[in-house]
Amino acid sequence: MRKFGFYILFIFSIIFGTENRKLGQTGFQFLSVTSDARSGGMADAMTTMHDKSTSLFSNPAGLSKQTERFDVNFSSNNWIAGIKHDAFSFSLSPSNGQFGVFGFSLLNVDYGELQGTMVWDNSQGFIDTKKFKPSAFAMGLGYGRSLSENFSIGGQLK
């Protein structure tokens, strides 16, 4: 009887425990878009490999591996449907990283011009409204520092 109860519980947990209902849409997805060619070429598998200012976009602790006094990066990607994604990052390592590495980043997305619509009781089910131009912008300040040869910390305020 005990095994039977376990099997019933196991079956119910498989059936109902994996339910994944999408209740809403997520925002700020532009923050997760690859911002540089090196990351894009490696399918974003860059979490532990950063040593430039671009680490601000995925792992700010990577700033601590920077060997130059400063680093600047600018990238611009034109996507389908007229979407334009621009990124800028700058990092500075005063005193050869003795005090850590400071960084600054900008992200901008221009989604182009879109036609607005509204639900309406007609044969199409909608009417056209005016056109609009959505965009998104993020700015961040970051810091990274090595605590040992194999351990670094970092963070960013956006």
Task: Label each PLM-derived region with a short phrase.
Residues 18-158:
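Subset of outer-membrane beta-barrel
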Residues 10-17:
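Hydrophobic h-region of N-terminal signal peptides that target proteins for export
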Residues 1-4:
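Positively charged n-region of N-terminal signal peptides that target proteins for export
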